[in-house]
Amino acid sequence: MKASMFLALAGLVLLFVVCYASESEEKEFPRELISKIFAVDDFKGEERECKGFGKSCVPGKNECCSGYACNSRDKWCKVLLGK
């Protein structure tokens, strides 16, 4: 009887600890999200890598990687053939 009471009490304490931990993580989530948004803004000024096969592009801007060309009709990088 004593063992089952102790086990039930330990289970309730464990449940309380898990709920408290998950609730504190939820409170920090908006702060983490905002910091990640501002971290993404820091990278906007940097030069981006070239775009590979199937990535959207703007014709004439030379955004595609070497061996690919921006198709003016489909507006995505395709394999450059013949040139």
Curated annotation (Swiss-Prot):
Expressed by the venom gland. Keywords: Amidation, Disulfide bond, Ion channel impairing toxin, Knottin, Neurotoxin, Secreted, Signal, Toxin, Voltage-gated sodium channel impairing toxin. Changing K51L: No gain of activity against hNav1.7/SCN9A. Changing V79W: No gain of activity against hNav1.7/SCN9A. GO terms for cellular component: extracellular region. One of its GO terms (molecular function) is toxin activity. It is found in: Secreted. Disulfide bonds join C50-C65, C57-C70, C64-C77. InterPro entries: Huwentoxin-1 (IPR011696), Huwentoxin_CS1 (IPR013140). The keyword Signal applies. Residues 1-21 form the signal peptide. The modification Leucine amide is found at L81. Residues 22-48 form a propeptide. Negative results: has no effect on mammalian SCN3A/SCN1B (Nav1.3/beta-1), SCN4A (Nav1.4), SCN5A/SCN1B (Nav1.5/beta-1), and SCN9A/SCN1B (Nav1.7/beta-1). Has also no effect on sodium subtypes in rat DRG neurons containing Nav1.1/SCN1A, Nav1.6/SCN8A, Nav1.7/SCN9A, Nav1.8/SCN10A and Nav1.9/SCN11A. The presence of a 'disulfide through disulfide knot' structurally defines this protein as a knottin. Weakly blocks the rat SCN2A/SCN1B (Nav1.2/beta-1) sodium channel (IC(50)=68 uM) and the insect sodium channel para/tipE (IC(50)=4.3 uM), without altering the activation or inactivation kinetics (depressant toxin). Monomer. Belongs to the neurotoxin 10 (Hwtx-1) family. 14 (Hntx-1) subfamily. This is Mu-theraphotoxin-Hhn2b 1. It comes from Cyriopagopus hainanus. The lineage of its organism: Eukaryota, Metazoa, Ecdysozoa, Arthropoda, Chelicerata.
